Amino acid sequence: MIRTVQLSEIRENIKEMCIEANHFLSPDMAEAMKQAQQNEKSPLGKQILGQLQENLEIAAQDMIPICQDTGMAVVFLEIGQEVHFEGGSLEEAVNEGVRQGYVEGYLRKSVVGDPLIRENTKDNTPAVLHIRIVEGDRVKTKVAPKG
């Protein structure tokens, strides 16, 4: 059975994921950071991990990026072979989601469109897009800012 997915949903999800990935660690990563600080033997190492933990808390509380280098948006899509997209181009929807996420999230724009010309796109597009076709009728999306 074919399932129709609106590209506006993909765009909105990617926008939100760009903002979230730059402001918060996933719960498992946040827990790993706490464990690393607790298990660290070196006083200097403990202090540095404590500063990183404080940075994470400030970023979440004040809605500022965890790191000033918000990097390139790398988008991973697993698309079920029973999925049909409506509403335009998948690549354009992904890039528009990245554009909106980086603009609305007040994230640093540092991507160049052509590496030889070195002109900043001012919206962090184009995204690096990895697509995998899988069985089923679902779309799984992951966004990783790579700074």
What does each of the following model-derived ranges do?
Residues 1-147:
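Non-transmembrane, aqueous-exposed alpha-helical and coiled segments at domain scale
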